[in-house]
Amino acid sequence: NLLANHDSRNARIDHPGIYGSYLSTHRGNVDYRNNVIYNWGSNTTYGGEDGSFNIVNNYYKPGPASKEKKYFVDAYWYNSSSNVGSAYPRLYMSGNYHAGSYASSINGDQWSGVYYHPQGNDPSTTDGRLSAPLSIKAGDATVCHTTTHTAAGAFDAVLSYAGASLCRDAVD
């Protein structure tokens, strides 16, 4: 996937409020993998309140409108009064790459690429750091499998194959 030229929501990961009374039955683990995020404006990937996410091998390439953010994820937290959770997201971080020279330090330390958005009386930021990827299951509870590229491989694949039509044209 190519997420390009947005001011924000690159992606806005899984806000628990969208589930209403179905939160316990419809919310599951989310796998955000092999995306190219370009020219993000004011924010890159953010949100995730009290959810569970694999953030793997995504390529963050700043463009002319990109703010100099030194992170992959801006993690949000909800308090218990919101009735939708009371924690930052649980994250498995691996292989993400930030092409901005101002942010090269986060490529070697994925956790330094997570910004825990300050929202008052926050819980510990280390509780949600997962050391192994989350299992992703289909509706029938079978485990899903996917091809995983390196972040650089994903960047090359997206530039080579993503576009508006099957046949490459001037727009692609």
Where are these regions (language model features)?
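Glycine- and acidic/polar-rich repeat regions and solenoidal domains
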Residues: 1-145
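Extracellular low-complexity, Gly/Ser/Thr-rich intrinsically disordered linkers
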Residues: 125-172
